[in-house]
Swiss-Prot record:
The keyword Glycoprotein applies. Keywords: Glycoprotein, Golgi apparatus, Membrane, Repeat, Signal-anchor, Transmembrane, Transmembrane helix. Its main location: Golgi. The chain crosses the membrane at residues 21-43. It is found in: Golgi apparatus membrane. Residues 44-571 are extracellular. GO terms for cellular component: Golgi membrane. Sialate:O-sulfotransferase that catalyzes 8-O-sulfation at the Sia-glycan level using 3'-phosphoadenosine 5'-phosphosulfate (PAPS) as a donor, forming 8-O-sulfated Sia (Sia8S)-glycans. Displays selectivity toward glycoproteins such as TF/transferrin. It is a single-pass type II membrane protein. Residues 133-225, 236-330 form the WSC domain. This is Sialate:O-sulfotransferase 2. Glycans are attached at residues 195, 248.
């Protein structure tokens, strides 16, 4: 140690006497390091031929009766490991990544320019598909005293786009969307103003260069093509159906008012003002209230029985004294909104198990409303925590949550739970939902480039076998398993959610379940305006998935359970 210190002192004194040599050597050292760093930047990852790829992709075995399922037991990092593990890596300079003929196809500008050009073309095609969902009508006069579109409105002086306005109006069930001042969006069921010259609509959208968003007191108006569920709305109110008058009207619907000039919006506005979630139109009378056991809204009647025209709006139906037209207002039913952690640590761990894309997040929302307790998760998703799932941050074994979300399969993971609700969904729908989540978020959409590119076929090849093994594993290794089909939950939420609450050991309260029915969508439903315009499944994909469906159906029936719904397709 003393010798080393002595040598260091000699070097220090030497360079102190000759500083020029010191800085020269330092500059040479830094230059050499920079060259090594720059050289490492030329390392690429060329595509590996199919013959060299990992065989763990789970491709069907030729000549076999059923497709090969493989050992697809994924851990907590399942979202990232599937793709990473299936590709072998090779490193080398980029000029060896492609042969001469392949590089020639890229032109003089190389791959980066081609990718940028391709991305622009894809974005233009996506925009064209979005525009097909709405037809431009024209430029219309607008006045603050007498609006052309008299529904809801919202403003965004930084990020307003045509599609954003259309999407918001479509979600609320309006037929028309109009943009003004480059940043204002108005919705309505009819245009109540005159058409003017197109040159008057000359203001660019604040969030989209090159797009027109009206002008000064001028609206750029679009006619929307609504999804089926959106078409059953009236502005911000949701159409619930035609129902027979309840036996004890004053108890079922406690607030009533006579309206000689009845219209849907007048009754909805009255009940909204009185803070009731239901508006029932009965000819010239408007009734307001909550869904209760006296008026549960479960037995719908033929809409022709409610087809009496409104006195103030000839194109609207206002029901009769015996048959009510019912709308749900935007007033929140607070009877099922309180949530908390379990007061004492639970002795049982109950899983809410599903394949990704099968509606687990939605089911958690329903369970929290129905029980009043937070649900937990085997994972952690910050975006879900920010949306109100406060149990997301708890460890899954904490015992403070009513059940635990999990996508796990495999004996060890399953046997860690004392019981499970197994949520099963049509694989065709589940795969598409998970693909949208993966590339677009919980309520977003994957871009058309992802559907048309290599991502979708690879996704189906990896995830379709897992849809089957996930269900089979839970049926085999689960201690107590309640099977709930996503489609049944949507169609008969009251009954199916009651079954789920019973398994969780919580008393079933009918009024609370009725409250959940009116809040069932939450903030976890994708927009109705933007839909995929074609079937992404090839004939080969459908044959493979059909075999998995038959396998799961057989397993369910062998345990005296209901088989998969008929909507899954031929078996």
């Amino acid at each position: 140690m003393a010798k080393l210190w002595f040598k260091f002192q000699r070097c220090f004194r030497y360079f102190r006497r000759k500083p020029v040599r010191f800085f020269t050597l330092l500059a040479i050292y830094l230059t050499a390091g920079s060259l090594v760093f720059l050289h490492s930047g030329f390392v690429g990852q060329p595509a590996v031929p199919q013959s060299q790829a990992s065989p763990a992709a789970g491709s069907p075995v030729e000549g076999a009766e059923l497709p090969f399922l493989g050992d697809l037991h994924l851990g907590r990092g399942f979202r990232d490991t599937v793709e990473a593990s299936s590709i072998a890596r090779r490193y080398g300079p980029t000029f060896k990544g492609k042969d001469t003929s392949e590089r020639a196809k890229l032109g003089d500008y190389g791959g980066a320019w081609s990718r940028a050009l391709k991305g622009r073309v894809v974005r233009e095609k996506e925009k064209e598909k979005e525009e097909e969902k709405a037809k431009y009508i024209g430029c219309y006069l607008d006045d603050t005293q007498s609006r052309a579109l008299r529904g809801v409105s919202f403003f965004d002086y930084k990020k307003m786009t045509v599609f954003r306005c259309q999407d918001n109006c479509a979600e609320r069930g309006y037929l028309y969307a109009g943009l003004e001042f480059g940043a204002e969006c108005y919705c309505g069921h009819k245009i109540q103003a005159a058409n003017v010259s197109e040159s008057d609509c000359d203001m660019e959208c604040k969030g989209e260069r090159g797009s027109v968003c009206g002008g000064i007191n001028r609206l750029s108006v679009y006619r929307l093509q609504l999804a089926q569920e959106s078409a059953r709305r009236y502005g911000s109110a949701v159409f619930r159906g035609c129902f027979r008058r309840p036996n004890n009207l004053s108890l079922a619907l406690p607030v009533s008012a006579a309206m000689p000039n009845m219209s849907v919006d007048k009754c909805v506005d009255l009940c909204t003002e009185k803070e009731f979630p239901l508006a029932a139109l009965a000819g010239t009378a408007c009734h307001c209230g909550f869904p209760t056991t006296r008026f549960p809204l479960h037995d719908r009647e033929d809409e022709q029985l409610c087809a009496q025209k409104c006195s103030a709006e000839e194109f609207e139906s206002c029901g009769t004294p015996s048959y009510f037209i019912v709308y749900q207002t935007q007033v929140q039913d607070n009877r099922c909104m309180d949530r908390r952690f379990l007061p004492a640590k639970s002795k049982k761990l109950i899983a809410l198990a599903s394949f990704p894309g099968a509606g687990n997040t939605w089911a958690r929302h329903l369970i929290e409303l129905a029980t009043g307790f937070y649900t937990g998760s085997y994972y952690f998703d910050g975006s879900l925590y920010n949306k109100g799932f406060k149990g997301e941050r708890d460890h899954w074994r904490s015992g403070r949550t009513i059940c635990i979300k999990t996508h796990e399969s495999g004996q060890k993971e399953i046997e860690a739970f004392d019981a499970a609700i197994l949520l099963i969904r049509n694989p065709y729908k589940a795969l598409m939902a998970e693909f949208n989540r993966k590339y677009g978020g919980h309520i977003g959409f994957a871009a058309h480039a992802h559907w048309k590119g290599k991502e979708w076929p690879e996704f189906v090849r990896n995830y379709a076998p897992w849809w089957a093994t996930h269900t089979l594993d839970w049926l085999k290794f689960g201690k107590t398993v309640l099977v709930v089909h996503f489609e049944d939950l949507k169609q008969d939420l009251f009954t199916q959610l009651g079954r789920m609450v019973s398994l969780l050991g919580v008393a079933v309260r009918e009024d609370r379940l009725l409250c959940v029915e009116s809040q069932k969508d939450g903030n976890f439903k994708r927009s109705g305006l933007r839909k995929l315009e074609y079937d992404p499944y090839t004939a080969e994909m459908r044959r493979t998935i059909a075999a998995y469906i038959r396998m799961v159906d057989t397993a369910l029936r062998s345990r005296n359970l209901t088989g998969v719904p008929d909507a899954y397709g031929p078996r």
